Swiss-Prot record:
Domain of life: Bacteria
Family statement drawn from the similarity comment of this UniProt entry: Belongs to the universal ribosomal protein uL15 family.
Presence of keyword Ribonucleoprotein: yes
Function: Binds to the 23S rRNA.
Signal sequence annotation: none
One GO term (biological process): translation
Name of this chain's protein: Large ribosomal subunit protein uL15
A GO cellular-component term linked to this record: cytosolic large ribosomal subunit
Ranges where the record places region Disordered: 1-52
Compositional bias of kind Gly residues: 21-35
Classification lineage: Bacteria, Pseudomonadati, Chlorobiota, Chlorobiia, Chlorobiales
Keywords, sorted A to Z: Ribonucleoprotein, Ribosomal protein, RNA-binding, rRNA-binding
Gene designation: rplO
Quaternary organization: Part of the 50S ribosomal subunit.
Pfam families noted in UniProt: Ribosomal_L27A
Length: 182
């Protein structure tokens, strides 16, 4: 016995059903679609109908909601920052622009520094949020933290100010005046 003499077991491989190839084939003329009507024509698909039964899209409840003004916060661990510094992708000063390019994020994203990992050298980090453990580890390594108030997109939209200054500019808090009924 050799490889050239191997064959599949009898009945294991069926021939492909060739539809619409003459009446002698058994699947000619109407090609298994019955006689005339919309269902026999090309392009027909059965509608999502379950007869008299309540359809699934009405049996299942609606749920969930996506906030239109949600903040997309990207987590960045200290271990990632240490790795970037080892590989030469980041210097001892990490800004929001650096984080955007390193994390392949959008300009409208926020960044949160998390405390997973250790820092070997002092780092100056600018981010939107910092966890307590990350803050302790950065300060322990001799680094500094600066919290940004705005996203890159918001900072770029401020006229006559560089992006670095725009990031630090606090947002104006709008307070509604209460109407006093008299």
């Amino acid at each position: 016995m050799d490889l050239s003499s191997l064959r599949p077991a009898k009945g294991a491989v069926k021939n492909k059903k060739r539809i619409g190839r003459g009446p002698g084939s058994g699947n000619g003329t109407t090609a298994g679609k019955g006689n005339k009507g919309q269902q026999s024509r090309s392009g027909y698909t059965r509608p999502v109908s379950e007869g008299g039964q309540m359809p699934i899209y009405r049996r299942l409840p609606k749920f969930g909601f996506t906030k239109p003004n949600r903040k997309n916060v990207i987590p960045v661990n200290l271990s990632q920052i240490a790795l970037w510094m080892e590989n030469g992708k980041a210097t001892s000063e990490i800004t929001v622009e650096n984080l955007k390019s390193l994390c392949s994020a959008r300009r409208a994203d926020y960044f949160k520094i998390l405390g997973n990992g250790e820092l070997k050298s002092p780092v100056t980090i600018t981010a939107h949020f910092v966890s307590k453990s990350a803050q302790e580890k950065i300060l322990q390594a001799g680094g500094t933290i600066t919290l940004a108030e705005r996203t890159l997109l918001e900072a770029e939209r401020i006229k006559d100010t560089p992006v670095e200054e725009g990031l630090m500019k606090p947002k104006a808090r709008l307070r509604k005046k209460k109407k006093i009924k008299s």
